[in-house]
């Protein structure tokens, strides 16, 4: 009783912003551009709580008057069966084979109406559409399977189980493995797995690949010697000497100890010292070329750089000791030149700001307008997406409610009889009500319903060779879970949502195509025209004069 106002609100919602019920993978922002069926459309198809309450009140009033409760329910079921039979007859007449009329050449005197024939042939060819190939004899859709082969039937049953499992699982917590896994002889029919497990397997695979891949070997390269022009200091040289005491040659240490000696070494000694340093470095890196740890490599780098720096500083000081004054003059001239450049740049900036001061207000206004437009567009998009999500959730909830109510109405008579039989000995009203609510056996349906069910019909058609085939026994046991559920209801948009995730070659595979046709025709009862139109848009097959279906 508390849910009735919610249904009223849903019924009074506007038509704008509704979504299509089938394509859940489309972008939600595109939904308001193409408005489809609104929630008012659901009143025609979905039995909501209001209608169910009206029906239950009518039953209560009729029972109070004196009419039999079970008699009313039997009348309702009889009416429904008559309506279903009439619908079946109409469909059979529509799908009945009608031989094509021969288009004969019509002569009126000496004229031949060939143009009319060409137009007629074009219209006939345009009605036929291309479909994925489905076998005729070895096919679970065919009425007789006496001459059918075992292997194709087994593959079709595996694909059928995978499809039924994908249609009935909770996609928020579980996902199906690929369709190819359903033909595995160890686990025929495929299986589901949790999203948590899939993510864990992916992370484990990435870690294993990272562990297998060989690490990249880093080759140590000696950096090139750079000559610095800065003024050397005695303090820096002594510090560098203390750092480079373990990696420098004895000649370089002698040079760094006596930077201002009266007997400067010759150029040959400098060259030999640099060569000795390079030889020592190469000799330290060449033997065995074993990969060192990162800390050792960094320490060796620091030692070599300090040794090289001391050598270059001493060489530059000995060469450019008499020309220190010229260097100072050059530094002064460079500083004056930099000051001139800064003054010129400041003057240019002041002139440019005065010129741009007139342009800035116009640019600010245009930027503000564009920002406002972007914000409005973004907020409208968010509103549209939220509205579309709300309508899709409401429609899905409406479909679930309809399925549950149809099941309750279908089993209402049988459940009522069982509850009535629970009053074997009338003792106390409260105790009898508790007995009635405590134990109610599950209703398995009558013989007529079982005979018309798709699972029992399929079992009666299958050949004995297939039933004795060992892998087929496993898949038949798995299909029994879905076959014994007489109240299994699957909506067409759920089927299209699952098929949207399949690849094109999987949709066109003969075994999978047969399983899809079986589910569409016998379980979901989806119109063939709707499925063909969806398939044309999914596969983008051009309309042609030939058909690959039966």
Swiss-Prot record:
Residue ranges of coiled coil: 71-98
Protein name: Coiled-coil domain-containing protein 60
Spans traversing the lipid bilayer: none
Gene behind the chain: CCDC60
UniProt KW keywords: Coiled coil
Polar residues: compositionally biased ranges: 336-345
Region of interest called Disordered, as start-end residue ranges on this chain: 1-21, 219-293, 336-367
Organism per entry: Homo sapiens
Low complexity composition-biased segments: 235-256
Cysteines engaged in disulfide bonds, as pairs: none
Keyword set includes Signal: no
Keyword NADP: no
């Amino acid at each position: 009783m508390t849910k009735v106002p919610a249904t009223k609100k849903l019924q009074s919602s506007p038509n704008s912003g509704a979504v299509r019920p089938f394509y859940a993978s489309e972008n939600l922002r595109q939904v308001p551009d193409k408005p489809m069926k609104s929630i008012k459309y659901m009143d025609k198809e979905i039995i909501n709580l209001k209608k169910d309450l009206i029906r239950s009140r009518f039953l209560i009033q009729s029972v109070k008057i004196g009419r039999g409760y079970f008699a009313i329910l039997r009348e309702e079921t009889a009416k429904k069966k008559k309506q279903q039979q009439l619908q079946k007859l109409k469909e059979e007449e529509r799908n009945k084979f009608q031989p094509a009329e021969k288009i004969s050449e019509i002569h009126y005197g000496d004229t031949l109406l060939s143009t009319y024939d060409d137009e007629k042939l074009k219209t006939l060819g345009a009605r036929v559409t291309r479909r994925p190939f489905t076998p005729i004899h070895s096919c679970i859709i065919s009425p007789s399977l006496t001459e059918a082969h075992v292997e194709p039937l087994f593959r079709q049953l595996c694909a059928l189980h995978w499809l039924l499992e994908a249609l009935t699982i909770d996609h928020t917590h579980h996902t199906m493995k690929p369709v190819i896994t359903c033909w595995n002889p160890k686990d025929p029919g495929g299986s589901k797995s949790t999203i948590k497990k899939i993510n864990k397997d992916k992370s484990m695979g990435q870690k294993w690949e990272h562990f297998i891949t060989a690490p990249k070997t880093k080759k140590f390269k000696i950096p090139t010697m750079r000559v610095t022009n800065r003024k050397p200091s005695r303090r820096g040289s002594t510090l560098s000497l203390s750092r480079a005491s373990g990696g420098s040659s004895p000649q370089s240490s002698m040079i760094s100890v006596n930077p201002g000696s009266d007997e400067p070494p010759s150029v040959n000694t400098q060259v030999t010292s640099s060569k000795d340093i390079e030889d020592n470095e190469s000799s330290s890196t060449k033997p065995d070329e074993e990969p060192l740890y990162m800390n050792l490599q960094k320490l060796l780098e620091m030692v070599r750089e300090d040794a090289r720096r001391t050598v270059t500083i001493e060489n530059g000081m000995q060469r450019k000791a008499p020309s220190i004054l010229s260097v100072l003059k050059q530094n002064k001239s460079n500083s004056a030149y930099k000051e001139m450049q800064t003054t010129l740049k400041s003057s240019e900036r002041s002139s440019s700001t005065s010129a741009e001061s007139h342009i800035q207000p116009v640019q600010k206004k245009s930027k503000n307008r564009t920002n406002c437009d972007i914000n409005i567009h973004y907020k409208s998009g968010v509103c549209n997406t939220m509205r579309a999500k709300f309508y899709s959730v409401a429609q899905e909830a409406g479909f679930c409610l309809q399925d549950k109510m149809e099941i309750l109405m279908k089993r209402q008579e049988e459940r009522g009889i069982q509850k009535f039989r629970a009053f074997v000995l009338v003792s106390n009203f409260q105790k009898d009500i508790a007995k009635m609510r405590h134990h109610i056996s599950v209703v398995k349906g009558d013989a007529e319903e079982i005979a018309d069910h798709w699972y029992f019909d399929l079992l009666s058609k299958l050949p004995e060779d297939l039933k004795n085939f060992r892998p087929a026994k496993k898949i038949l046991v798995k299909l029994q879970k879905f076959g014994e559920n007489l109240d299994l209801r699957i909506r067409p948009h759920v089927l299209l949502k699952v098929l949207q995730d399949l690849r094109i070659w999987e949709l066109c595979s003969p075994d999978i195509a047969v399983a899809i046709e079986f589910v569409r025709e016998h379980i979901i009862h989806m119109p063939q025209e709707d499925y063909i139109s969806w398939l044309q848009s999914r596969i983008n097959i051009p309309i042609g004069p030939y058909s690959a279906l039966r």
